[in-house]
Amino acid sequence: MTNGYIGSYTKKNGKGIYRFELNENQSRIDLLETGFELEASTYLVRNNEVLYGINKEGEQCGVASLKIDDNGELHLLNKCLSSKAGTGCYVSISEDKRYLFEAVYGDGIIRMYELNTHTGEIIRLIQELAHDFPTGTHERQDHPHAHYINQTPDGKYVAVTDLGADRIVTYKFDDNGFEFYKESLFKDSDGTRHIEFHDNGKFAYVVHELSNTVSVAEYNDGKFEELERHLTIPESFDGDTKLAAVRLSHDQQFLYVSNRGHDSIAIFKVLDNGQHLELVTITESGGQFPRDFNIASSDDLLVCAHEQGDSVVTVFERNKETGKITLCDNTRVASEGVCVIF
C-alpha cells in the first residue's frame, strides 16, 4: 500500500490535507480521508517522514510542518506564520534539507525559511522578497505573480517562475536569504507557471499557464534558453482553459501536463536525452479542473485531483512503453483538491 497526500483550498468544503492509500495491485484508492485540517494548505512537499504545507490563520500566513507516523497519519510539529503579505501557492525544500522555499502568487513574493535538520521543524522566516519586474499585457498580469520556486539541478540557485512577468528568475541563497543572479524571458502573455527538470540537469520543461504551452529549455548556470515549444491542447479548441501541472515519469521517458477547462492531460514522448518532445495524445482527466496529479514511484499509476465540480480524484493505469494512461473504475472525492504528492 502506498500512502499519498492531497493539499486543498479551504474556501468551501476543503479540509486542508487529505491522506489516501493507493492499492497498486488493484489500481485503486482504498482509503481517502482527512489527514489534517490545515487552512489554505494548497501545496505540500515531503522530506522523508516530515510533511510541509502552506498555511494561514487569520491574516498571518506561512507554513506548517507535520510528522508522518508509521501508519501515514499526520501530527503537527510546528507552524511559522510570520507574514501578512499573502498565502503561498508552492513550497519546496533545499537539497541539504536546511531551507524551505515558498512562492506567493498574489503579491509576487518569495520566502525562505530555516529548518531544523534533525526534527524537521521550521525555525524561522529568513527573508521575504517581493518581485519588481516588468509585467506582460494579459489581463492577469497586472503585477508580478511568483508561482514556483525550487532548487536548480546544479544545486547553486533557486529558480522562480513569475506568471505576471513571463520569466524565470534565479537567485543565489544562503543563511542571509536570496541574491538575484539571472533572469530568462519568455513570450508576452505566456504566464510562466512551473518547471520540471530532466534528471540529466541539462534540460527543463517550462509550462505556461496563459498560452497553454510547454517549452523545452536548455539549462546552464542559472539561465534557461528555449529550444522548442508545444501546445498542450488541440489547436481547434477555443474554450476557456489554462494549463496547470507538469510531471515527468520516473523513467524520464514521458512528460505529462494537465489542462484546466479542457479538462485533460497531455502526454509527450521525451526524445534525444531530453532536448525534444513529441505529442503522444491528450486524454480526458475524468473530472473538472485537473489542478494537479502525480505518478506513483512504480510508474504504473497516475493520480489526479480536480479542484472544481465534484472534486473527484481519478486513478489511471499507465503504459510504460507508450506513456498512455487509462482511467480506472475508481474515483474518490477530495473537496477543492489542488496538490498530489507521494
From Swiss-Prot:
Top-rank taxon, per record: Bacteria
Instruction: Tell me the lineage of the source organism.
Output: Bacteria, Bacillati, Bacillota, Bacilli, Bacillales
Record protein name field:
Uncharacterized protein SAB1858c
State the family named in the UniProt similarity comment for this chain. Belongs to the cycloisomerase 2 family.
**What are the GO cellular component annotations?**
cytosol
Gene Ontology MF: a single term: 6-phosphogluconolactonase activity
Species for this entry: Staphylococcus aureus (strain bovine RF122 / ET3-1)
In terms of InterPro entries, this protein maps to: Cycloisomerase_2, Haem_d1_sf, Lactonase_7-beta_prop, WD40/YVTN_repeat-like_dom_sf
